[in-house]
């Protein structure tokens, strides 16, 4: 493992300033359950890690007049047991419970789950120089690809491992991104980037930007939702395939029915 410096900003502004001044050898850390694995295995070799946990006020679930606001550093365990989420957004509640183990959910965060790196074993092997790491080919195309994409491959056949993303997208969630130029809000569905757009990244965050909040429109009384995740093992695992479903109505009167596939 390469040595690195740990930065502990006290505000979002300080974190953005560190990002702007640190070039491309810097990583953001929230819970650290994914990033520290990459660092230990030599897949990520940052000079600086910015620990967002030292910034106060980024863990919250609040109901406003037009949306539910969820802070990026909200623990997955807190999201899963929040009464508002359990009662009004069962699909999101189920997705949060589907992540990993209770121990990991106590540490992992909403922002970390939405911004994690892919689980492709070629990408995760520091000795394999795949396209996502600057190489010339996707080894999954003709190699071991049991867990890779059936559709939309080409440059890279990785799939995205987040359980929260399909559920939140089914609720038409918005991502709030902090930048040195001010905050910007966009649909969470537009937060992600296919390999054809940027082979080295899975989202559209710029080098001086960070995700600090997710917003979900207020639920309606007639809303129904669910999340299902199929795994190879009975114990915790990443999805072979997953689906989030959200609709309004009942019986034959369904409107705005959405099915978001993952895994």
State each model region's role.
Residues 1-263:
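C-terminal structural segment of proteins
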